[in-house]
Amino acid sequence: MPIKDYYQILGVSKDATAEEIKKAYRRLAKEYHPDISADENASEKFKEINEAYHILSDEERRKEYDRILKSGDEKSYRDFMEYIQDFLESIWQGMRRSPKPKKGGDVRLKLELTLEEAAFGCEKDIEYERWIDCPTCEGKGYVGKMEKVTCHACEGTGRRVSGIFSFPRPCSVCKGRGFIIKNQCPACSGRGRVAMHSLLRVNVPPGTDEGDVLKVPGKGHTGERGGEAGDLYLRVSLKPHPIFKKVGKDLYMEAFISFPLAVLGGTTKIKTLEGSYQEVFLQPGTECGSTKRLQGLGYPIAGGRGDLIITFRIEVPKNVNSNIRALIEKLAKELGEEGIEYQSGVITKILSLLKL
């Protein structure tokens, strides 16, 4: 590897002071900055100028380089360059004439659904904030023809020296461009993007479950410099249901039946998740707390549907008139209950037997 003459690249003598080296670097970096210079080889020259300054601006690196330059030892020079390669790689980044397009950021939101909406699918309107290209300047950051002035922070070099190693980094003021746009767009303050309140209708597929993430491509933040937009991610959260409790793909519910139906048996109608009614036959002597499983009426999940498990509760009348009281007293006698003279106590006991 031939030894480069970094003093010659910067146009300074080998005994130049640190201030002279810095001054030469700023002048050349400004002249050959890829965003300013019309020279077709500006990027390579700018890269070489930064490499030279990186080595000569540090006292220890300059001392080692001077030793190698004096001896002409190309092997030592190659080892020296490999040693500082990590530093140089960070300099080469971002020195292209046209920065790469940058994909927009993703937007992540919580989507609350009822059990019915998630089970059978629906359409939901989503409101959220996202960054889009400024409609005033069409994402350029300026209106009309660009008017630019030299960045005062880096003096047009696009780089600023910072850190204990005097390492040149992209200027944070001008973002490494070496200039500042004078006629910035007033609508976006030169950013080229503005926040917009968006309204989007999304399709929720049937069988959506708690924790599922729905992806809407291209509905995140708009990209920069022509980059593609980010995506919108919606994490599903199921609202508590007043009737059904979901456990996996099964649904659980409680159904209240009358005392005569529990004793005599018969059919009752159960409202399903769809909103339709399903007839259920009860055997005579159905006890409070007994369950019945209806296959295929649970929650729809990919590959099948769960079951509906019903727990029956016996509904006890709260307002007992004289006719009902007489019937219960007669029932108590038939069942062999003692202490009929304590009518209130017996009635209370019978009613308590019907409860949980």
UniProtKB/Swiss-Prot annotation:
Any GO CC annotation of this UniProt entry: cytoplasm
Any one GO BP annotation for this protein: protein refolding
Cofactor note (record): Binds 2 Zn(2+) ions per monomer.
Localisation: Cytoplasm
Cofactor: Zn(2+)
Amino acids binding Zn(2+) 1: 134, 137, 185, 188
Annotated J domain residues: 5-69
Keywords: Chaperone, Cytoplasm, DNA replication, Metal-binding, Repeat, Stress response, Zinc, Zinc-finger
Top-level lineage group: Bacteria
GO molecular function: ATP binding; heat shock protein binding; unfolded protein binding; zinc ion binding
Zinc finger map (CR-type): 121-197
InterPro entries the record matches: DnaJ, DnaJ_C, DnaJ_domain, HSP40/DnaJ_pept-bd, HSP_DnaJ_Cys-rich_dom, HSP_DnaJ_Cys-rich_dom_sf, J_dom_sf
CXXCXGXG motif repeat segments: 134-141, 151-158, 171-178, 185-192
Function as written in the Swiss-Prot or TrEMBL entry: Participates actively in the response to hyperosmotic and heat shock by preventing the aggregation of stress-denatured proteins and by disaggregating proteins, also in an autonomous, DnaK-independent fashion. Unfolded proteins bind initially to DnaJ; upon interaction with the DnaJ-bound protein, DnaK hydrolyzes its bound ATP, resulting in the formation of a stable complex. GrpE releases ADP from DnaK; ATP binding to DnaK triggers the release of the substrate protein, thus completing the reaction cycle.
Subunit structure, as described in the record: Homodimer.
Record remark: domains: The J domain is necessary and sufficient to stimulate DnaK ATPase activity. Zinc center 1 plays an important role in the autonomous, DnaK-independent chaperone activity of DnaJ. Zinc center 2 is essential for interaction with DnaK and for DnaJ activity.
This protein's name: Chaperone protein DnaJ
Lineage summary: Bacteria, Pseudomonadati, Aquificota, Aquificia, Aquificales
Gene from which the chain derives: dnaJ
